[in-house]
Each structure stands twice: as C-alpha cells, then as structure tokens.
Amino acid sequence: MEEYTEGYLRALGQFRGSRYDNSFIVRIHYARIRKAGPDCQFRCRCLRDGKRSQQLQAEAWEGKCLVGTLQVELLFYGTKVNHTREVGLQMRGAGPPEGYGPWRSFSPEQVAAFARRTGDANPIHQGKRPVVPGLLLWQSLLARLGEPERLHMVFKAPVHGGEMIYIREEQVNERNEREFASV
C-alpha cells in the first residue's frame, strides 16, 4: 500500500485565508507508525500560533490509533523572507555545490496543477515564476525515497518553478538511515 499523502494535504488545507498569503513553509517533519490509507481519518491542529509563524500538525488516525503525523512550520510574510526579489537558490551561484547531483525541477505548470489540486491559493505559487510548494517537494521526495518512516526537511530559500533541485545523500548512522540535503 502506498502512503495516502493526499489526506495530510487536505487536512492542512483547512488553514487558509488572507493570513496565509505569501507565507512560506520553513520546516516539515513527517513520521509514521504505519502507512496511512484513504480510509484513515485526517485531522489538523495548530500546535503553535505566533505573530510571525505558525506550527500545524496533520494527523492520520485509524480508529483510535494515531498512525502518522505531518508537522509544518509556516513563516508569515515579513522582512526575513525573500519575497520581492524573486531570487531562488540557483540564482545565487553557478551550479550545485560539490557532491550534489541533479534531482529534478518542477515546471510552473506542475506547480499550478498542484496548487489547483490541493486548493492552495497562496499568491507565491502562481504566475510565471512561482515558488514550488514545500508540500509538493515533500510529497515528491517521500516517493523518491521509497516512503521512509520519517522525513525532516528544512527550507532555507525558495525554489522557483523551472529551477533544478540538487541533492546529496549521506548515511547518518549505524542503522543506515539516510539523510538528503538539497539546494
């Protein structure tokens, strides 16, 4: 059975409105006991609600058993986030850092299709040079890794539609758990 990621996305989708316009996901943490299926009940709750940021947690429940969580930390529009200059990671330097290889890029059309499918009305995910949604990156990387039980992602700068994303894989402990870094 494949992980039913759509349930997590729909649960997070209940948090919408003008407050979320131009907000960025800065961190995602996913963990599961077992894969959530379409029969699970998905809920979302706010763990922390601040003036500049918010932490949300989507949960997958099978009966009375919590089977998975997806935590998302949002940074609301402010001076610390690069909104207006439209500089992505690859515009900061030529080529990937040493040891990184190409993973993939997302076209503006793919970004728009994801936004339509999930009901994402954030203006940064629209237009000719949209920012790739963090949840699209999460969903794609989760599939690429073979649906690991845990995945932690930190976003240091926006990635725009059409920009190549580069990753590096590392073994991080004696259990051969993998860590991926991307730029």
Features from the language model and the residues they span:
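Residues in well-ordered beta-strands of folded domains
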Residues: E73, A115, V154
